[in-house]
């Protein structure tokens, strides 16, 4: 593990960990999923780095074919675990899923900002933050959304899990392809366009 990644993780997690002693109940649980996303990002970074150093894959091939698989599986693990073990209410499952994605995206953007300091302009940094941040949130939210149905039916549980993961992996891969194309704006607009339907659904289902 690179010392830089560990230091960034500690610097981000240490202040947030103080809130664990203040929050109670559902708030503490949701914060726990934020931590899970942050940790999974650091873990995914190590796996992706191993692929990069031990194979002849190009950056384009790696980001389109490998990292979506690694990252989406790791992000989905906490969501799948609580869906099948604790069987929470759909609203809580959706909130937990998006918090894992947000935690992952936050850690990833901090690492990108640290490693690319001076190489990216302000517009590129902001665009990357919005695009990748929302993409990770939406892809994990999609898994949580699918789990609200799959976890309620034994017949759908295994097939639903595979379908949810496959969808999030393909979505992630399409995003990575778009942002590296000649029209990166399409990649940035993709998560924005897909987040809106989820937002409307959650607000509609939320108890008054």
At which residue positions do the language-model features occur?
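Hydrophobic alpha-helical segments at protein termini of multi-pass membrane proteins
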Residues: 1-208
């Amino acid at each position: 593990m690179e010392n830089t990644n560990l230091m960034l993780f500690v610097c981000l997690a240490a202040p947030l960990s103080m809130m664990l002693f203040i929050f109670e109940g559902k708030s503490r649980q949701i914060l726990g999923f934020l931590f899970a996303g942050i940790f999974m990002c650091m873990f995914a970074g190590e796996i992706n780095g191993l692929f990069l150093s031990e194979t002849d894959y190009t950056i384009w091939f790696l980001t389109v074919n490998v990292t979506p698989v690694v990252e989406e599986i790791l992000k989905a693990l906490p969501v799948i675990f609580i869906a099948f073990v604790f069987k929470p209410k759909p609203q809580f499952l959706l909130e937990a899923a998006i918090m894992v994605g947000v935690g992952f995206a936050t850690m990833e953007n901090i690492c990108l900002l640290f490693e690319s300091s001076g190489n990216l302009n302000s517009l590129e940094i902001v665009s990357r933050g919005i695009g990748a941040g929302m993409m990770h949130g939406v892809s994990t939210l999609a898994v949580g959304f699918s789990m609200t149905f799959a976890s309620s039916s034994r017949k759908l549980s295994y097939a639903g899990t595979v379908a949810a993961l496959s969808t999030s992996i393909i979505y992630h891969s399409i995003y990575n392809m778009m942002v590296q194309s000649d029209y990166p704006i399409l990649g940035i607009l993709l998560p924005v366009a897909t987040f809106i339907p989820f937002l409307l659904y959650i607000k509609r289902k939320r108890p008054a």
